[in-house]
Curated annotation (Swiss-Prot):
It comes from Campylobacter jejuni subsp. jejuni serotype O:2 (strain ATCC 700819 / NCTC 11168). Keywords: Carbohydrate metabolism, Cytoplasm, Hydrolase, Magnesium, Metal-binding. GO terms for biological process: fructose 1,6-bisphosphate metabolic process; fructose 6-phosphate metabolic process; fructose metabolic process; gluconeogenesis; sucrose biosynthetic process. This is Fructose-1,6-bisphosphatase class 1. The gene is fbp. Binds 2 magnesium ions per subunit.
Length: 280
């Protein structure tokens, strides 16, 4: 698996370099779920596809920007699912964005998830790699990723990052969010899932939520590219995840590679509070 991770590092570095002088305009194309693709979405996907295709350990790749699974080497063991540029709609305002990767063994399913990574393209290039414990790495002046620290969630946080259009929220979700603000939680929502999860993880706690809504009853975030890898990282850091009903997002199973789900990521306290609010 280390070979796979090393190729992901190469792809992340190339995307980071390309972001210094990006084309932030939209293409004429839409991805599988109907999002109009930015030209840099397409470029990022091409960079990752090109780089990972050189790795003999990768059986197939699954991209948020591709309709189907792309088989590379049927004799290999690992399947890499990825969101090439999470938060790309924020490029025009120069917010931090990132790439998300899940490494599955043999078959793409949460129970076969062996490692997860995400990159942050911000004031500096950082990479979180998680096999048994999330570890933060930072690019140094020699273009090397150096280890910074292990990441661990506190039992309770102060950050409340909540997505979805408020007028379409269910009443129970609106009440839950209000109860957090009544406790003194701070709103920290950028519109880039990877950035918001990163802040919660590095600050040690809080909650990120993207609930079922009237206009998106199955949520909007994609299980294989976004939800599963970030749930894996949060849980390995000592946090909790749920879809509002179960005890872990990693219990979920889907047949379609572009399946979506409501999702909540956070510290023990916030997720327990949410489950109580959702299931009273």
């Amino acid at each position: 698996m280390q070979e796979v991770i090393s190729y992901i590092q190469k792809a992340v570095l190339e995307i980071s370099n390309a972001l210094k002088f990006p084309d932030t305009s939209y293409s004429q194309n839409q991805n599988f779920t109907g999002d109009t693709q930015l030209k840099f979405d397409v470029l990022s996907d091409e960079i990752i596809t090109k780089t990972l295709s050189q790795c003999s350990s990768i059986k197939a790749i699954i991209s948020e920007e591709k309709d189907e699974i792309l088989t590379l080497n049927e004799r290999a063991n690992f399947i890499v699912a990825y969101d090439p540029l999470d938060g790309s709609s924020l490029m025009d305002v120069n917010f931090a964005i990132g790439s998300i990767f899940a490494i599955y063994e043999e078959k793409a399913s949460a129970k076969n998830l062996r490692a997860a990574l995400y990159s942050m393209y911000g004031a500096r290039l950082e990479l979180v790699i998680c096999k048994d414990q999330p570890k933060l790495y930072r690019l140094n002046a020699n273009n090397e990723f150096i280890f910074i620290k292990d990441l661990r969630m506190n039992e309770k946080g102060k950050i409340n990052a909540t997505g979805g259009t408020q007028k379409f929220w269910e009443e129970k979700h609106a009440k839950f969010i209000k109860s957090l603000f009544d406790e003194g939680y701070r709103l920290r929502y950028s519109g880039a899932m990877v950035s918001d999860i990163n802040q919660i993880l590095l600050k040690g706690g809080g909650i990120f939520s993207y609930p079922a809504t009237q206009d998106a009853p199955n949520g909007k975030l994609r299980a294989f590219f976004e939800v599963f890898p970030l749930a894996f990282i949060i849980e390995k850091a000592g946090g909790k995840t749920t879809n509002g009903k179960n005890r872990s997002l990693l219990e979920l199973e889907f047949d379609k590679i572009h399946a979506t789900t409501p999702c909540f990521f956070g510290s023990e306290y916030e997720i327990s509070k949410l489950l109580k609010a959702y299931n009273e």
